[in-house]
Curated annotation (Swiss-Prot):
Gene3D superfamilies the record matches: NADH-ubiquinone/plastoquinone oxidoreductase chain 6, subunit NuoJ (1.20.120.1200)
Name by which UniProt lists this protein: NADH-ubiquinone oxidoreductase chain 6
Organism taxonomic ancestry: Eukaryota, Metazoa, Chordata, Craniata, Vertebrata
Entry's Gene Ontology BP terms: mitochondrial electron transport, NADH to ubiquinone; mitochondrial respiratory chain complex I assembly
Major enzyme class: translocase
Protein's membrane topology: Multi-pass membrane protein
Transmembrane segments: 1-21, 25-45, 47-67, 88-108, 149-169
Length: 175
């Protein structure tokens, strides 16, 4: 049952990114990023990385929601465009969904997929095993995982927030 839940969460995760890439209005872009952040952290928490999922979600909401709040405030429209109002946007959205379905069928057909990384152990990178010592709780080990195995997540998140703020400042400054 949990495999199906993770599969459904993964599909929602990718569909939300396809929805973000074909967003017609900044309001919907921020909405689907919040949904994708919550679903992604749910996937991490399903594999046992509760603290890492919580930290990523808090960093995500703390940083990116502020950036998209400013974006929405600067580019607000009285009648925002939706996905079905433009045939090009709807076509890009449907093409992205078709590509996702083809990728899912390819992954389900083969046992091990090695596109960029090898995906044999799905959640192994999100779990920091404590071993046989029962003196440590999962939350303490989650903090250790955030700064050891999850250091690249913190670096990428910080860099993404910096780039996002600089892009928003450049767009809103205008000429």
């Amino acid at each position: 049952m949990m495999t199906y839940i993770v599969f459904i969460l993964s599909v929602i995760f990718v569909v939300s990114f396809v929805g973000f890439s074909s967003k017609p209005s900044p309001i919907y872009g921020g909405l689907v990023l919040i949904v994708s952040g919550g679903v992604g952290c749910g996937i991490i928490m399903n594999f046992g990385g509760s603290f890492l999922g919580l930290m990523v979600f808090l960093i995500y909401l703390g940083g990116m929601l502020v950036v998209f709040g400013y974006t929405t405030a600067m580019a607000t429209e009285q009648y925002p465009e939706v996905w079905v109002s433009n045939t090009t946007v709807m076509g890009v959205f449907l093409l992205g969904l078709l590509m996702e379905v083809m990728l899912v069928l390819y992954v389900l057909k083969s046992e091990e997929v090695g596109v960029v990384f090898k995906f044999s152990g799905v959640g192994a990178w999100a779990i920091y095993d404590t071993g046989d010592s029962g003196a440590f709780s999962e939350e303490i080990m989650g903090a250790a995982a955030l700064y050891s195995y999850g250091a690249w997540v913190v670096i990428v998140t910080g860099w993404s927030l910096l780039v996002g703020v600089l892009v928003i400042l450049e767009v809103t400054r205008g000429d």
